[in-house]
A protein has these predicted regions:
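Active-site bordering "gate/hinge" segments
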Residues: 1-312, 318-321, 404, 440-445, ...
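Dual-mode signal for accessory low-complexity, basic/Gly-rich regions
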Residues: 253, 264-471
Length: 471
Protein backbone atom coordinates (compact mmCIF):
# COMPACT_ATOMS: atom_id res chain seq x y z
CA UNK A 1 0.00 0.00 0.00
CA UNK A 2 2.96 2.32 0.58
CA UNK A 3 3.94 2.23 -3.11
CA UNK A 4 0.33 2.76 -4.17
CA UNK A 5 0.01 5.86 -1.98
CA UNK A 6 3.31 7.14 -3.35
CA UNK A 7 1.97 6.77 -6.89
CA UNK A 8 -1.18 8.70 -5.93
CA UNK A 9 0.87 11.57 -4.47
CA UNK A 10 3.06 11.77 -7.57
CA UNK A 11 0.00 11.73 -9.82
CA UNK A 12 -1.52 14.57 -7.80
CA UNK A 13 1.66 16.64 -8.05
CA UNK A 14 1.73 16.05 -11.80
CA UNK A 15 -1.88 17.25 -11.93
CA UNK A 16 -0.84 20.57 -10.37
CA UNK A 17 -1.10 20.02 -6.61
CA UNK A 18 1.26 22.05 -4.44
CA UNK A 19 0.59 19.56 -1.64
CA UNK A 20 -0.88 16.06 -1.65
CA UNK A 21 -1.42 13.17 0.73
CA UNK A 22 -2.80 9.69 0.15
CA UNK A 23 -4.22 7.23 2.69
CA UNK A 24 -4.84 3.58 1.92
CA UNK A 25 -7.05 1.90 4.51
CA UNK A 26 -8.11 -1.68 5.24
CA UNK A 27 -10.82 -1.89 7.90
CA UNK A 28 -12.70 -4.76 9.54
CA UNK A 29 -15.52 -4.24 12.05
CA UNK A 30 -17.40 -6.92 13.95
CA UNK A 31 -20.42 -6.61 16.27
CA UNK A 32 -22.26 -9.24 18.29
CA UNK A 33 -25.37 -8.31 20.32
CA UNK A 34 -27.94 -10.33 22.23
CA UNK A 35 -31.34 -9.28 23.54
CA UNK A 36 -33.62 -11.22 25.88
CA UNK A 37 -31.81 -14.48 25.31
CA UNK A 38 -31.52 -14.27 21.53
CA UNK A 39 -28.98 -13.01 19.05
CA UNK A 40 -30.15 -9.50 18.13
CA UNK A 41 -27.37 -8.33 15.81
CA UNK A 42 -24.40 -9.95 14.12
CA UNK A 43 -22.18 -8.21 11.60
CA UNK A 44 -18.68 -8.64 10.21
CA UNK A 45 -17.82 -5.94 7.67
CA UNK A 46 -14.64 -5.37 5.70
CA UNK A 47 -13.79 -2.42 3.47
CA UNK A 48 -10.74 -1.10 1.66
CA UNK A 49 -9.84 1.87 -0.48
CA UNK A 50 -7.67 4.93 -0.97
CA UNK A 51 -8.36 8.61 -0.30
CA UNK A 52 -6.33 11.44 -1.86
CA UNK A 53 -6.31 15.04 -0.58
CA UNK A 54 -4.67 17.87 -2.53
CA UNK A 55 -4.05 21.61 -2.53
CA UNK A 56 -4.32 23.33 -5.91
CA UNK A 57 -4.05 27.14 -6.07
CA UNK A 58 -4.95 27.37 -2.38
CA UNK A 59 -8.09 25.21 -2.61
CA UNK A 60 -8.60 21.76 -1.13
CA UNK A 61 -9.79 18.80 -3.15
CA UNK A 62 -10.51 15.24 -2.05
CA UNK A 63 -11.47 12.07 -3.89
CA UNK A 64 -11.46 8.38 -3.06
CA UNK A 65 -11.59 5.03 -4.80
CA UNK A 66 -12.40 1.58 -3.49
CA UNK A 67 -9.84 0.02 -5.84
CA UNK A 68 -6.46 -0.50 -4.19
CA UNK A 69 -4.82 -0.58 -7.60
CA UNK A 70 -2.71 1.78 -9.68
CA UNK A 71 -5.80 2.76 -11.68
CA UNK A 72 -7.72 3.52 -8.49
CA UNK A 73 -4.88 5.61 -7.07
CA UNK A 74 -4.36 7.62 -10.27
CA UNK A 75 -8.09 8.19 -10.78
CA UNK A 76 -8.55 9.43 -7.20
CA UNK A 77 -5.59 11.80 -7.55
CA UNK A 78 -6.87 13.22 -10.84
CA UNK A 79 -10.38 13.75 -9.49
CA UNK A 80 -9.09 15.37 -6.27
CA UNK A 81 -7.04 17.85 -8.31
CA UNK A 82 -10.01 18.58 -10.58
CA UNK A 83 -12.29 19.20 -7.59
CA UNK A 84 -9.75 21.58 -6.04
CA UNK A 85 -9.32 23.47 -9.30
CA UNK A 86 -13.10 23.77 -9.68
CA UNK A 87 -13.26 25.34 -6.21
CA UNK A 88 -11.36 28.34 -7.56
CA UNK A 89 -9.07 29.09 -4.65
CA UNK A 90 -6.96 31.58 -6.54
CA UNK A 91 -4.31 31.91 -3.85
CA UNK A 92 -2.02 30.03 -1.51
CA UNK A 93 -2.59 28.18 1.75
CA UNK A 94 0.18 27.70 4.29
CA UNK A 95 0.53 24.50 6.30
CA UNK A 96 2.49 24.17 9.53
CA UNK A 97 5.80 22.42 8.79
CA UNK A 98 6.24 18.73 9.55
CA UNK A 99 9.44 16.73 9.66
CA UNK A 100 9.61 14.04 6.93
CA UNK A 101 9.74 10.57 8.45
CA UNK A 102 9.21 6.86 7.83
CA UNK A 103 7.67 5.07 10.80
CA UNK A 104 5.20 2.44 11.96
CA UNK A 105 2.82 2.20 14.92
CA UNK A 106 0.58 -0.58 16.18
CA UNK A 107 -1.78 -1.18 19.08
CA UNK A 108 -0.51 -3.43 21.85
CA UNK A 109 -2.84 -6.45 21.86
CA UNK A 110 -2.78 -9.52 24.11
CA UNK A 111 -5.71 -11.41 22.54
CA UNK A 112 -6.61 -10.69 18.92
CA UNK A 113 -10.39 -10.06 19.08
CA UNK A 114 -10.85 -11.52 15.61
CA UNK A 115 -9.29 -14.79 16.76
CA UNK A 116 -12.15 -15.30 19.24
CA UNK A 117 -14.87 -17.37 17.52
CA UNK A 118 -18.26 -15.78 16.91
CA UNK A 119 -19.91 -18.60 18.86
CA UNK A 120 -17.76 -17.78 21.89
CA UNK A 121 -18.73 -14.11 21.68
CA UNK A 122 -22.41 -15.00 21.48
CA UNK A 123 -22.11 -17.26 24.52
CA UNK A 124 -20.23 -14.50 26.36
CA UNK A 125 -23.07 -12.03 25.70
CA UNK A 126 -25.78 -14.52 26.65
CA UNK A 127 -24.07 -15.30 29.97
CA UNK A 128 -23.69 -11.58 30.76
CA UNK A 129 -27.28 -10.92 29.80
CA UNK A 130 -28.59 -13.78 31.95
CA UNK A 131 -27.57 -11.90 35.09
CA UNK A 132 -29.82 -9.00 34.07
CA UNK A 133 -33.01 -11.03 34.12
CA UNK A 134 -35.56 -10.36 36.81
CA UNK A 135 -39.30 -9.69 36.73
CA UNK A 136 -39.03 -5.92 36.35
CA UNK A 137 -36.41 -6.04 33.58
CA UNK A 138 -38.28 -6.33 30.29
CA UNK A 139 -35.29 -5.73 28.02
CA UNK A 140 -31.89 -7.27 28.78
CA UNK A 141 -29.08 -6.57 26.32
CA UNK A 142 -25.39 -7.38 25.96
CA UNK A 143 -22.98 -6.56 23.16
CA UNK A 144 -19.34 -6.74 22.13
CA UNK A 145 -17.50 -5.10 19.24
CA UNK A 146 -14.10 -5.18 17.60
CA UNK A 147 -12.32 -3.15 14.93
CA UNK A 148 -9.02 -3.42 13.12
CA UNK A 149 -7.79 -0.60 10.88
CA UNK A 150 -4.59 -0.85 8.86
CA UNK A 151 -3.60 2.35 7.11
CA UNK A 152 -0.73 3.84 5.19
CA UNK A 153 -0.19 7.59 4.80
CA UNK A 154 2.19 9.12 2.25
CA UNK A 155 2.52 12.90 1.87
CA UNK A 156 4.32 15.17 -0.55
CA UNK A 157 6.20 16.50 2.50
CA UNK A 158 8.04 13.19 2.69
CA UNK A 159 6.04 11.28 5.31
CA UNK A 160 5.63 7.51 4.85
CA UNK A 161 3.70 6.11 7.80
CA UNK A 162 2.04 2.77 8.54
CA UNK A 163 -0.33 2.13 11.46
CA UNK A 164 -2.44 -0.77 12.70
CA UNK A 165 -5.07 0.19 15.29
CA UNK A 166 -7.19 -2.41 17.11
CA UNK A 167 -10.24 -1.65 19.24
CA UNK A 168 -12.44 -3.85 21.39
CA UNK A 169 -15.32 -3.18 23.77
CA UNK A 170 -18.71 -4.13 25.11
CA UNK A 171 -21.44 -3.42 27.60
CA UNK A 172 -24.80 -4.39 29.10
CA UNK A 173 -28.14 -2.58 29.44
CA UNK A 174 -31.16 -3.41 31.60
CA UNK A 175 -34.49 -1.66 30.97
CA UNK A 176 -37.01 -2.04 33.79
CA UNK A 177 -40.70 -1.27 33.22
CA UNK A 178 -43.53 -0.81 35.73
CA UNK A 179 -46.24 1.59 36.92
CA UNK A 180 -46.07 3.55 33.67
CA UNK A 181 -42.31 4.10 33.95
CA UNK A 182 -39.28 2.79 32.09
CA UNK A 183 -35.81 3.07 33.61
CA UNK A 184 -32.47 1.98 32.16
CA UNK A 185 -29.17 1.07 33.80
CA UNK A 186 -26.01 0.48 31.83
CA UNK A 187 -22.52 -0.82 32.51
CA UNK A 188 -19.71 0.15 32.11
CA UNK A 189 -21.10 3.15 30.26
CA UNK A 190 -24.25 4.28 28.48
CA UNK A 191 -24.84 4.52 24.73
CA UNK A 192 -22.82 1.55 23.55
CA UNK A 193 -20.77 0.49 26.54
CA UNK A 194 -17.07 1.28 26.56
CA UNK A 195 -14.29 0.44 24.14
CA UNK A 196 -10.52 0.69 24.27
CA UNK A 197 -7.61 0.42 21.90
CA UNK A 198 -6.78 -3.11 23.01
CA UNK A 199 -7.71 -6.72 22.34
CA UNK A 200 -10.30 -9.14 23.71
CA UNK A 201 -8.55 -8.93 27.07
CA UNK A 202 -10.22 -5.54 27.58
CA UNK A 203 -13.72 -7.02 27.25
CA UNK A 204 -12.82 -9.76 29.72
CA UNK A 205 -11.57 -7.13 32.19
CA UNK A 206 -14.93 -5.32 32.21
CA UNK A 207 -16.61 -8.03 34.29
CA UNK A 208 -19.96 -7.79 32.51
CA UNK A 209 -21.27 -11.07 33.94
CA UNK A 210 -20.16 -10.06 37.45
CA UNK A 211 -21.82 -6.63 37.31
CA UNK A 212 -25.09 -7.69 35.67
CA UNK A 213 -27.09 -8.48 38.86
CA UNK A 214 -26.22 -5.08 40.36
CA UNK A 215 -27.22 -3.31 37.14
CA UNK A 216 -30.58 -5.11 37.03
CA UNK A 217 -31.26 -4.44 40.72
CA UNK A 218 -30.68 -0.71 40.29
CA UNK A 219 -32.88 -0.57 37.18
CA UNK A 220 -35.71 -2.19 39.14
CA UNK A 221 -35.17 0.05 42.18
CA UNK A 222 -35.48 3.16 40.03
CA UNK A 223 -39.12 2.27 39.33
CA UNK A 224 -39.87 2.92 43.02
CA UNK A 225 -37.60 5.94 43.43
CA UNK A 226 -38.96 9.51 43.62
CA UNK A 227 -38.36 11.89 40.74
CA UNK A 228 -35.53 14.39 41.16
CA UNK A 229 -37.00 17.60 42.59
CA UNK A 230 -36.02 21.00 41.15
CA UNK A 231 -33.61 23.19 43.07
CA UNK A 232 -30.15 24.71 43.28
CA UNK A 233 -27.65 22.59 45.17
CA UNK A 234 -24.16 21.12 45.20
CA UNK A 235 -23.56 18.08 43.02
CA UNK A 236 -20.92 15.38 42.82
CA UNK A 237 -20.72 13.91 39.31
CA UNK A 238 -19.24 10.48 38.65
CA UNK A 239 -16.34 9.87 36.26
CA UNK A 240 -18.45 8.54 33.37
CA UNK A 241 -20.81 11.53 33.30
CA UNK A 242 -17.85 13.89 33.68
CA UNK A 243 -16.37 12.37 30.54
CA UNK A 244 -19.43 13.38 28.50
CA UNK A 245 -19.42 16.80 30.19
CA UNK A 246 -15.84 17.28 28.98
CA UNK A 247 -16.72 16.01 25.50
CA UNK A 248 -19.68 18.32 24.94
CA UNK A 249 -18.71 21.50 26.80
CA UNK A 250 -14.93 21.52 26.28
CA UNK A 251 -14.07 19.18 23.42
CA UNK A 252 -16.40 20.41 20.71
CA UNK A 253 -16.10 24.15 21.47
CA UNK A 254 -12.28 23.99 21.38
CA UNK A 255 -12.19 22.38 17.92
CA UNK A 256 -10.56 25.18 15.98
CA UNK A 257 -12.58 24.71 12.79
CA UNK A 258 -15.74 25.43 14.80
CA UNK A 259 -14.10 28.47 16.39
CA UNK A 260 -13.14 29.80 12.95
CA UNK A 261 -16.65 29.18 11.61
CA UNK A 262 -15.73 26.62 8.96
CA UNK A 263 -17.59 23.77 10.67
CA UNK A 264 -21.08 23.77 12.13
CA UNK A 265 -22.56 20.35 11.33
CA UNK A 266 -23.91 18.14 14.12
CA UNK A 267 -22.54 20.13 17.04
CA UNK A 268 -22.72 23.76 15.95
CA UNK A 269 -19.93 26.31 16.12
CA UNK A 270 -18.42 27.65 19.36
CA UNK A 271 -18.81 30.43 21.89
CA UNK A 272 -15.02 30.82 21.83
CA UNK A 273 -13.02 33.23 19.64
CA UNK A 274 -9.44 32.90 18.35
CA UNK A 275 -8.29 35.77 20.58
CA UNK A 276 -9.52 33.93 23.71
CA UNK A 277 -6.54 31.59 23.88
CA UNK A 278 -4.28 32.55 26.77
CA UNK A 279 -6.83 34.80 28.47
CA UNK A 280 -10.36 33.38 28.64
CA UNK A 281 -11.41 32.12 32.06
CA UNK A 282 -13.01 28.76 31.22
CA UNK A 283 -13.46 27.52 34.77
CA UNK A 284 -12.07 27.45 38.27
CA UNK A 285 -8.32 27.06 38.93
CA UNK A 286 -8.96 23.34 39.57
CA UNK A 287 -9.93 22.82 35.91
CA UNK A 288 -7.14 21.27 33.83
CA UNK A 289 -7.92 19.69 30.46
CA UNK A 290 -5.39 17.83 28.30
CA UNK A 291 -5.68 16.34 24.80
CA UNK A 292 -3.42 13.28 24.78
CA UNK A 293 -3.22 10.92 21.78
CA UNK A 294 -0.54 8.90 23.61
CA UNK A 295 -2.91 7.65 26.36
CA UNK A 296 -2.60 3.87 26.74
CA UNK A 297 -5.79 2.15 25.51
CA UNK A 298 -7.36 5.43 24.35
CA UNK A 299 -9.55 5.25 21.24
CA UNK A 300 -7.96 8.53 20.14
CA UNK A 301 -4.46 7.11 20.50
CA UNK A 302 -2.18 6.87 17.46
CA UNK A 303 1.42 7.19 16.39
CA UNK A 304 0.59 9.94 13.90
CA UNK A 305 -2.59 11.78 12.97
CA UNK A 306 -3.92 11.71 9.40
CA UNK A 307 -1.69 14.65 8.44
CA UNK A 308 1.41 12.81 9.64
CA UNK A 309 1.89 14.78 12.87
CA UNK A 310 3.47 12.68 15.67
CA UNK A 311 1.25 12.12 18.71
CA UNK A 312 2.00 14.25 21.75
CA UNK A 313 -0.02 15.66 24.68
CA UNK A 314 -1.42 19.16 24.24
CA UNK A 315 -2.75 21.36 27.06
CA UNK A 316 -6.19 22.84 26.37
CA UNK A 317 -7.10 24.39 29.75
CA UNK A 318 -4.63 25.11 32.55
CA UNK A 319 -5.79 26.28 35.98
CA UNK A 320 -9.08 27.32 34.43
CA UNK A 321 -7.62 29.36 31.54
CA UNK A 322 -7.96 28.39 27.87
CA UNK A 323 -4.43 27.79 26.56
CA UNK A 324 -4.79 25.66 23.43
CA UNK A 325 -6.94 24.35 20.62
CA UNK A 326 -7.78 21.07 18.97
CA UNK A 327 -6.56 21.85 15.47
CA UNK A 328 -4.74 21.13 12.23
CA UNK A 329 -1.63 22.05 10.24
CA UNK A 330 -3.61 24.63 8.29
CA UNK A 331 -4.86 26.32 11.47
CA UNK A 332 -1.40 26.37 13.07
CA UNK A 333 -2.32 23.91 15.86
CA UNK A 334 -1.37 20.56 14.27
CA UNK A 335 -1.93 17.09 15.64
CA UNK A 336 -5.67 16.37 15.71
CA UNK A 337 -6.73 15.54 12.15
CA UNK A 338 -8.50 12.22 11.66
CA UNK A 339 -10.68 10.68 8.97
CA UNK A 340 -13.40 8.05 9.29
CA UNK A 341 -11.89 5.55 6.88
CA UNK A 342 -10.63 5.87 3.32
CA UNK A 343 -13.76 7.52 1.88
CA UNK A 344 -13.64 10.67 4.02
CA UNK A 345 -11.17 13.53 4.25
CA UNK A 346 -9.53 14.32 7.61
CA UNK A 347 -11.33 16.69 9.97
CA UNK A 348 -10.32 18.36 13.22
CA UNK A 349 -11.29 15.77 15.82
CA UNK A 350 -10.83 15.19 19.52
CA UNK A 351 -8.17 12.59 20.33
CA UNK A 352 -8.27 11.56 24.01
CA UNK A 353 -9.49 14.56 26.00
CA UNK A 354 -9.09 14.36 29.77
CA UNK A 355 -10.03 16.21 32.92
CA UNK A 356 -6.77 15.87 34.83
CA UNK A 357 -7.08 14.28 38.29
CA UNK A 358 -6.97 16.31 41.48
CA UNK A 359 -6.71 14.98 45.02
CA UNK A 360 -8.76 12.85 47.36
CA UNK A 361 -11.47 10.23 46.93
CA UNK A 362 -15.10 10.14 45.86
CA UNK A 363 -16.05 9.64 49.50
CA UNK A 364 -14.21 12.82 50.48
CA UNK A 365 -16.03 14.79 47.77
CA UNK A 366 -19.36 13.54 49.10
CA UNK A 367 -18.37 14.32 52.69
CA UNK A 368 -18.00 17.97 51.66
CA UNK A 369 -21.67 18.30 50.67
CA UNK A 370 -24.40 19.12 53.20
CA UNK A 371 -27.37 19.05 50.82
CA UNK A 372 -26.95 17.86 47.25
CA UNK A 373 -26.94 15.04 44.71
CA UNK A 374 -24.54 12.39 43.52
CA UNK A 375 -25.11 11.84 39.78
CA UNK A 376 -24.04 8.70 37.93
CA UNK A 377 -24.05 7.43 34.29
CA UNK A 378 -25.34 9.54 31.43
CA UNK A 379 -28.91 9.16 30.23
CA UNK A 380 -29.48 12.21 28.03
CA UNK A 381 -27.81 15.39 26.84
CA UNK A 382 -28.75 18.63 25.13
CA UNK A 383 -26.57 21.63 24.35
CA UNK A 384 -27.03 24.69 22.16
CA UNK A 385 -25.14 25.28 18.92
CA UNK A 386 -22.58 27.54 20.63
CA UNK A 387 -21.86 24.90 23.31
CA UNK A 388 -22.98 27.23 26.07
CA UNK A 389 -26.39 26.33 27.49
CA UNK A 390 -26.64 22.63 28.37
CA UNK A 391 -28.74 20.08 30.22
CA UNK A 392 -27.67 16.54 31.10
CA UNK A 393 -29.73 13.73 32.56
CA UNK A 394 -28.27 10.77 34.43
CA UNK A 395 -29.56 7.23 34.77
CA UNK A 396 -29.35 7.30 38.54
CA UNK A 397 -28.74 9.70 41.42
CA UNK A 398 -28.62 9.64 45.19
CA UNK A 399 -29.42 12.42 47.60
CA UNK A 400 -26.53 13.64 49.74
CA UNK A 401 -27.41 14.67 53.28
CA UNK A 402 -24.78 15.83 55.78
CA UNK A 403 -21.95 14.29 53.79
CA UNK A 404 -23.57 10.88 53.33
CA UNK A 405 -25.44 9.20 50.48
CA UNK A 406 -29.18 9.03 51.04
CA UNK A 407 -32.12 7.72 49.04
CA UNK A 408 -32.15 6.82 45.36
CA UNK A 409 -33.59 9.39 42.92
CA UNK A 410 -34.75 8.85 39.32
CA UNK A 411 -34.77 11.12 36.26
CA UNK A 412 -32.14 13.47 37.65
CA UNK A 413 -31.01 16.37 35.47
CA UNK A 414 -28.62 19.27 35.86
CA UNK A 415 -28.37 22.46 33.82
CA UNK A 416 -25.75 25.15 33.33
CA UNK A 417 -23.89 27.69 31.22
CA UNK A 418 -20.47 26.33 30.28
CA UNK A 419 -18.03 28.89 31.82
CA UNK A 420 -20.19 29.49 34.90
CA UNK A 421 -20.63 25.76 35.46
CA UNK A 422 -16.91 25.02 35.20
CA UNK A 423 -16.29 28.06 37.39
CA UNK A 424 -18.25 26.34 40.17
CA UNK A 425 -15.86 23.36 40.18
CA UNK A 426 -14.32 23.11 43.64
CA UNK A 427 -12.89 19.56 43.76
CA UNK A 428 -11.69 16.78 41.47
CA UNK A 429 -10.89 13.37 42.92
CA UNK A 430 -7.40 11.93 42.58
CA UNK A 431 -5.71 9.48 40.25
CA UNK A 432 -7.07 6.41 42.07
CA UNK A 433 -10.59 7.48 41.07
CA UNK A 434 -9.65 8.52 37.51
CA UNK A 435 -11.25 6.34 34.81
CA UNK A 436 -10.87 6.12 31.02
CA UNK A 437 -13.89 5.34 28.82
CA UNK A 438 -14.10 5.12 25.04
CA UNK A 439 -17.04 6.12 22.87
CA UNK A 440 -17.52 5.31 19.19
CA UNK A 441 -20.27 7.67 18.06
CA UNK A 442 -18.92 11.23 17.90
CA UNK A 443 -20.51 12.63 14.75
CA UNK A 444 -19.19 15.50 12.67
CA UNK A 445 -18.99 16.76 9.11
CA UNK A 446 -20.96 16.57 5.90
CA UNK A 447 -20.84 13.87 4.58
CA UNK A 448 -21.00 12.56 8.12
CA UNK A 449 -18.10 10.98 9.93
CA UNK A 450 -18.03 9.10 13.24
CA UNK A 451 -14.93 9.43 15.40
CA UNK A 452 -13.83 7.10 18.18
CA UNK A 453 -12.54 9.06 21.17
CA UNK A 454 -11.72 8.41 24.82
CA UNK A 455 -12.08 10.63 27.84
CA UNK A 456 -10.50 10.28 31.24
CA UNK A 457 -11.95 11.86 34.37
CA UNK A 458 -12.39 11.40 38.08
CA UNK A 459 -15.53 12.33 40.03
CA UNK A 460 -15.86 16.09 40.50
CA UNK A 461 -17.82 18.43 42.76
CA UNK A 462 -19.65 21.59 41.68
CA UNK A 463 -21.35 24.17 43.91
CA UNK A 464 -24.74 25.77 43.38
CA UNK A 465 -25.98 23.87 40.32
CA UNK A 466 -29.56 23.93 38.99
CA UNK A 467 -31.01 20.41 39.11
CA UNK A 468 -34.36 18.75 38.44
CA UNK A 469 -35.45 20.73 35.38
CA UNK A 470 -37.83 18.59 33.31
CA UNK A 471 -38.87 20.28 30.08
Amino acid sequence: MRELCGEAVEAARTAGASYADARAVLRRQQTVATKNGRVDALSDIESEGIGVRVLVDGAWGFACDRRLTADGAHDAAARAAAFARASGGGGTRELAPVEPRRATYETSVEIDPFSVPIAEKIDFCLRAEEGLRRAEVKVAEAFVRALREQKVLVTSDGAELEQELVECGGGIDATAVGDGLAQIRSYPSAHGGSSAQAGWEYVLSLGLEREAPRVAEQAAALLQAPECAPGVMDVVIDAEQMQLQVHESVGHPTELDRVLGSEAAYAGTSFLKPVDVGSLRYGSPLMNITADPTTPRGLGTFGFDDEGIPAEPQPIVREGVLVGWIGSREAGFPGSMRADGWSRMPLVRMTNLHLDPGEGSLEELIEGVDDGLYLETNKSWSIDDKRLNFQFGTQVAWEIRDGKLGKLVRDATYTGITPQFWGSLDAVAGLDAWRLQGLTNCGKGQPGQSAHVSHGAAPARFRGVQVGVHA
